């Protein structure tokens, strides 16, 4: 069968990517929700409980979309590649016929039980409800680990020296196939990615509800909801570069040809685009922090040790020097970098010289822009190719900026600036007073931008991981002999990734409005002046 307009491979790509996005949300949102519910119980703050319940309502609606797109994915895959699909399902029959359906049914039961016992198990029974949420998350994690087995198998099927791949797979157990080289790092990367993804989507929902709120009370709540969601998302985002590097390291260790194919050959411009998007993501996070600080009364009185801006300025060049001399996993790199990064927090109290919080944030922004520039610096000025003419390469002395030590240094600096801003923001809200509901209106567009960007990055890097198989369905085992067995251009891929992202965001937006609109006050209440609320 040949799908019109898109072709078979792109048709499979569209439904698979949509399914993965919905699945990522319903697997990541429960982690986000239980953390929020636990914080509400611990702090006795009903806002956290309301946040958790509202996101659960949206998750339940999107649960059906996950099932629909999953079923559609199987049908399209069978129609487009019947022989491969049948053979692949037989390889993982126990997963697809027993484990995955059983876990999915268990997740469905627990999801609905979690929602409909919310108002029943409260007060003294709240701990019971949180325990149910933890159980739901355990099942979600099991689903993630189970389904990542076949997914990672397609990139890194197990192998052994002296044995042909076909003979080894024929004798391999189900566990051998699941526990392949990229299975665990892929699972780790998806766990923290799903937590961040759930937080960004929750922030987008908060932005919609803030913009549609009719009363100051509702605006104050959804302002707070966006604030809480984005910082939970940041927690997941800070881990993603490192789990992503671990995944790339394991895949390159499995077959070194993956590395140049990603970084210097057919997919090099995909990685350039990834650098741009992740740089924009971190800039957006820190811009939201800046807008949040501006609405805190007393923020101008918050000071930070002079060591903070000094370390921000010297960290990038210092890290590049250390990484060049002591590359991973040499522990000497930590011996140099940890004292430097911790010095503002450990030694700052002994140094009387301080600077304002806003000065630190501004310097951090400049350092982030420089780090982004280093991250994006290519080895040369052509899209692909490892053997470029000298006039197309970076000038001698500047070529270091395209090396992996420089790239890792830029990532580390981006994460460090975000951590410093987070610490500074927490210090500000403890010493000042937040006027909830009075944040700059532009912050709502930042939240929507962050959700869109994180979704787009997921689509891009999913495409990269899949395209690493080159002209195989299962790398080195099952060849793809179809006419579509080629690496698409970045423009073609980006077009479909954007279309998929827009479709996903639109469906989530409708689900959020359907689930949460009744909770907004129907009658317009008279607005008074905003009441300052001390941050907790």
Stretch-by-stretch model annotation:
Residues 1-54, 58-67:
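N-terminal signal-anchor module of multipass membrane proteins
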Residues 23-34, 101-113, 193-206, 272-290, ...:
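Hydrophobic cores of alpha-helical transmembrane segments in multi-pass inner/ER membrane proteins
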């Amino acid at each position: 069968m040949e799908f019109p307009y898109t072709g078979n491979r792109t048709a499979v790509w569209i439904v698979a990517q949509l399914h993965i996005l919905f699945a990522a949300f319903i697997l990541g949102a429960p982690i986000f929700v239980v953390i929020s519910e636990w914080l509400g119980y611990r702090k006795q703050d009903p806002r956290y409980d309301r946040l958790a319940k509202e996101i659960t309502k949206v998750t339940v609606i999107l649960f059906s979309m996950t099932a629909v797109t999953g079923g559609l994915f199987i049908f399209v895959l069978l129609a487009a590649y019947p022989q491969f699909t049948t053979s692949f399902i037989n390889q993982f029959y126990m997963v697809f016929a027993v484990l995955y359906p059983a876990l999915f049914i268990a997740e469905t039961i627990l999801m609905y039980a979690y929602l409909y016992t919310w108002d029943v198990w409260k007060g003294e029974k709240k701990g019971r409800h949180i325990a149910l949420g933890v159980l739901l998350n355990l099942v979600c994690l099991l689903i993630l680990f189970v389904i990542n087995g076949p997914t990672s198998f397609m990139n890194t099927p197990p192998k052994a020296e002296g044995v042909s791949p076909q003979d080894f797979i024929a004798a391999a157990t189900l566990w051998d196939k699941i526990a392949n080289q990229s299975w665990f790092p892929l699972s780790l990367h998806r766990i923290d990615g799903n937590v961040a993804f759930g937080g960004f989507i929750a922030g987008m929902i908060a932005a919609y509800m803030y913009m549609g709120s009719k009363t100051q009370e509702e605006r104050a709540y959804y302002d707070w909801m966006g604030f809480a969601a984005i910082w939970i998302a940041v927690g997941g985002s800070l881990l993603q570069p490192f789990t992503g590097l671990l995944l790339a390291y394991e895949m390159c260790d499995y077959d070194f040809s993956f590395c140049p194919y990603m970084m210097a050959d057919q997919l090099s411009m995909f990685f350039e685009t990834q650098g741009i998007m992740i740089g924009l993501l971190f800039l957006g996070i820190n811009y939201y922090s800046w807008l949040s600080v501006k609405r805190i009364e007393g923020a101008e009185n918050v000071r930070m040790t002079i060591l903070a801006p000094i370390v921000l300025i010297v960290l990038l060049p210092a890290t590049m020097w250390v990484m060049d001399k002591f590359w991973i996993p040499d522990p000497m790199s930590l011996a140099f970098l940890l004292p430097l990064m911790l010095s503002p927090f450990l030694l700052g109290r002994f140094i009387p010289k301080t600077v304002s919080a806003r000065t630190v944030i501004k310097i951090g922004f400049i350092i982030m822009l420089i780090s982004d520039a280093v991250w994006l610096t290519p080895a040369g000025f052509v899209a692909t190719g490892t053997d470029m003419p000298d006039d197309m390469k970076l000038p001698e002395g500047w070529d270091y900026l395209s090396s992996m030590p420089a790239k890792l240094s830029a990532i580390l600096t981006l994460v460090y600036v975000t951590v410093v801003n987070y610490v500074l923001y927490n210090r500000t809200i403890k010493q000042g007073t937040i006027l909830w509901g009075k944040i700059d209106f532009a912050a709502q567009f930042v939240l929507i931008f962050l959700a869109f960007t994180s979704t787009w990055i997921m689509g891009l890097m999913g495409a990269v991981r899949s395209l690493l198989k080159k002209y195989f369905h299962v790398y080195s085992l099952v060849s793809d002999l179809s006419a579509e067995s080629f690496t698409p251009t970045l423009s073609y891929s980006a077009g479909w990734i954007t279309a998929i992202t827009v479709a996903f965001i639109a469906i989530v937006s409708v689900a959020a409005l359907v689930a949460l609109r009744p909770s907004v006050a129907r009658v317009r209440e008279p607005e008074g002046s905003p009441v300052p609320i001390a941050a907790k």
